[in-house]
Amino acid sequence: MHGPHHIFKEWADKYDGEFDEGWEALRKLTFEQQKAMGWIPKDAVLNPLAKGMQAWADVPKSQQEFQSRLMEIYAGFLEHTDTQYGKVVDELEQQGLLENTLILYIFSDNGPSAEGMGGSISELLAQNVMPSTVAQQLEVLDKDYGGMDALGGPKLDVMYHHGWAYSGAAPFQGTKLVAAQFGGTRTPLVLSWPKKIKHDGKVRPQFHHVNDIAPTIYDVLNITPPKMVKGVKQQPLDGTSLTYSFNQSDAKPAKT
């Protein structure tokens, strides 16, 4: 997810200390959990930290609290966002509509963003290639904003260290803007439609693209897109409906 990351302090505080072991440790933990859940093969091997990326052990002790806090803010933001989506689901259930509602939850539009570079109190510093060290930013943070409690608040546009982005891309290499690696381009999709999709707890391995969403919705609604609109010939839709995989986890992929 790109920045800036803003969240109420109490949400970030829920993750106090959770990331003090650094981004390599988080990437490894995520990788092992993905194995346990069946998302990746049991014999998969974790890639090492990408060349040129700063190792957690090389982050000065005086800066590690700052770097950890940026990830706590991000985690709090994610949980808060999920909670709001949950309210929509709860309302659908309360109205008796959830059973026959198709929900498509796409996690993001790309891989995790490394645009925060070395961790920043202002994402624009990194985006505009304005030279500044973490030490300089911490000095400004203390002098002008009152210290760490300002992180995640409305006066700053914080963005976490690229190491956290790399950890979030597990099990793949790369991050947002790196089109050559799956870590920059792949993102999970969760589907829910209780009336039509039998829950089997199995991950769907078929490869699909965001341009498959519209054909899926048309398919579900039994709609054939018009070939002509006001005398203008329409370009055929790219994409393939996902419905073939709804109740057959091992179905042959409809696209290659």
Predicted segments with their positions:
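Active-site His/acidic residue clusters
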Residues: 1-25, 29, 47-73, 107-126, ...
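Histidine-centered active-site microenvironments of extracellular/periplasmic hydrolases
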Residues: 4-9, 93-193
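Structured segments of extracytoplasmic/periplasmic soluble domains
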Residues: 18, 32-41, 91-95, 216-224, ...
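Alpha-helix capping and helix-loop boundary segments enriched in small/acidic/polar residues
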Residues: 18-25, 58-61, 65, 72-76, ...
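Proline-centered turn/helix-capping motifs that create local helix->coil transitions or kinks
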Residues: 38-46, 180-181
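Short coil/turn segments at secondary-structure boundaries
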Residues: 44-49, 255-256
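Outer-membrane beta-barrel transmembrane strands
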Residues: 73-88
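C-terminal cap/loop subdomain of S1 sulfatases and analogous C-terminal strand-loop tails that border
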Residues: 154-182, 196-206, 210-256
